[in-house]
Every structure is written in structure tokens, then in C-alpha cells.
UniProtKB/Swiss-Prot annotation:
Keyword annotations of the record: Repressor, Ribonucleoprotein, Ribosomal protein, RNA-binding, rRNA-binding, Translation regulation, tRNA-binding
Record keyword Translocase present: no
Top-level taxon in the UniProt lineage: Bacteria
Subunit structure: Part of the 50S ribosomal subunit.
Family recorded in the similarity comment: Belongs to the universal ribosomal protein uL1 family.
Name under which the protein is recorded: Large ribosomal subunit protein uL1
GO biological process entries: regulation of translation; translation
SUPFAM superfamilies assigned: Ribosomal protein L1
Short name of one Pfam family: Ribosomal_L1
Function, in words: Binds directly to 23S rRNA. The L1 stalk is quite mobile in the ribosome, and is involved in E site tRNA release.
Higher taxonomy: Bacteria, Pseudomonadati, Pseudomonadota, Alphaproteobacteria, Rhodobacterales
Length: 232
């Protein structure tokens, strides 16, 4: 433990005084100071000038990261008949209807993304209290309530990331693995920031993006210059 403590302290010292750096500098710093033996996720946290308690200030969207997330995404699909077959063929991990609803109600949630055909929403709607807090509730605004099940499953499996402003106006997500090339991480980060920028709600007042920070799963964070990250 002492050795890990020294590594963590060394990482914090390396980050000291580094603020509002470029995305490239932040990625290089994070990669050079990893102190654990597993492949950490590179995470982004964006503080936005919105209050998501107001409907006209909610920030929600989806972005396909150009280089994927490096994460294996487990996908569940609520569908029947031909659409259920389509979901299975597209690579969905779990496909069902009432049986899947009962599984979720029992507390067994073994998926990271949930997709549904429109006709299944009366069933899925009963699961709002379970799926909602986990940000798993299918929503047409992010393409997870759809008849094009094949495309939705492939997008989820291929590196598509959903985002939503949480309490305090913070949006956070994983944007790749530390093992990715620096250029690929930088590309993913700018794609994510660009998508959040385009999702600016009509009710947002004043500065929309207040702070952007990058970190690894176990490492300290570093703030990134907003104008450098938000390049159209």
C-alpha cells in the first residue's frame, strides 16, 4: 500500500499547477502518470451553466466516438417477433418482452444500454423507477426507442456514448481507454465536447461551458482549456 501511496503522491505532484492545459497536454500527462496495473478509463467531467431541474435547461444527447470507448457494452432490447430476431442477429446480449421486464423488476440488471421498439414502451414504462436512476431508460431523443433495432444495437456496441446533465449541471462520461494512442483519445475527447456543445438547451443563460476536466479512473484530474477542447 505504501508503494501505491508513493505513486499516487507522485502523480498528484506531476499535476500540481497544471490548469487549463490543451487536450493533448492533458492526455499526455494522464498517460505518463498512471499508477495502477489495469487499463484505466479516461474520463471527462464537464461543468455546465445549466440547472437540469428545469426542462428547458436539460442537456441530453448521444455521440458516436470516432475511436470507440474500448469498453464491452452489454445491450438489452425489448422487442417481439421479427424485431426480436433482428436484435439478436445484430448482437444484442439480452432480448425479451414481459420476461425481460420481470427480470429487471427482480433487480437483475446485466446490461449497460437498453433499447426498445415503440410498441414495447407500455411495458418498459413500468420500469422507470428501476431504469431511470441508472440512466438506462429508453428514450427516442437518444435513439434508444426505435424500429431500427439493428442500427441501434450496432451503434451501442460500436462506441456510441449517451450523456445527460446530472445534479449541478455536470456531464461525465468515459471517452476511451488509457491504452489508446494519444491522438485517438484527443479525437474522442473533442468529439464528445463538440456533441455537448451542440446540445446546448434554449434555456441556458450566461456561460454554457464552465469547466472541463480529464482524469483516469484512479488518477487526479486536470482542467482543460475550454476553447481548446471545443473545436468545431
Amino acid at each position: 500500500m505504501a508503494k501505491l501511496g508513493k505513486r499516487a503522491r507522485a502523480a498528484r505532484e506531476a499535476f500540481a499547477g497544471k490548469e487549463n492545459v490543451t487536450v493533448e497536454e492533458a492526455v499526455a500527462l494522464i498517460k505518463a502518470n498512471s499508477s495502477v496495473k489495469f487499463d484505466e478509463t479516461v474520463e471527462i467531467a464537464m461543468n455546465l451553466g445549466v440547472d437540469p431541474r428545469h426542462a428547458d435547461q436539460m442537456v441530453r444527447g448521444v455521440v458516436g466516438l470516432p475511436n470507440g470507448t474500448g469498453k464491452t457494452v452489454r445491450v438489452a432490447v425489448f422487442a417481439r417477433g421479427a424485431k426480436a430476431d433482428e436484435a439478436t442477429a445484430a448482437g444484442a446480449d439480452i432480448v425479451g418482452a414481459e420476461d425481460l421486464m420481470e427480470t429487471v423488476q427482480s433487480g437483475k440488471i446485466e446490461f449497460d444500454r437498453c433499447i426498445a421498439t415503440p410498441d414495447m414502451m407500455p411495458i418498459v414504462g413500468r420500469l422507470g423507477k428501476v431504469l431511470g436512476p441508472r440512466n438506462l431508460m429508453p428514450n427516442p431523443k437518444v435513439g434508444t426507442v426505435t424500429m431500427d433495432v439493428e442500427a441501434a444495437v450496432k451503434a451501442a456496441k460500436g462506441g456510441e456514448v449517451q450523456f445527460k446533465a446530472e445534479k449541478g449541471g455536470v456531464v461525465h462520461a468515459g471517452v476511451g481507454k488509457l491504452s489508446f494512442d494519444e491522438a485517438k483519445l484527443v479525437e474522442n475527447i473533442r468529439a464528445f465536447v463538440g456533441a455537448v456543445s451542440k446540445a446546448k438547451p434554449t434555456g441556458a443563460k450566461g456561460a454554457y461551458m464552465k469547466k472541463i476536466a480529464l482524469s483516469s479512473t484512479m488518477g487526479p484530474g486536470v482542467s482543460v482549456a475550454i476553447e481548446d477542447a471545443n473545436v468545431e
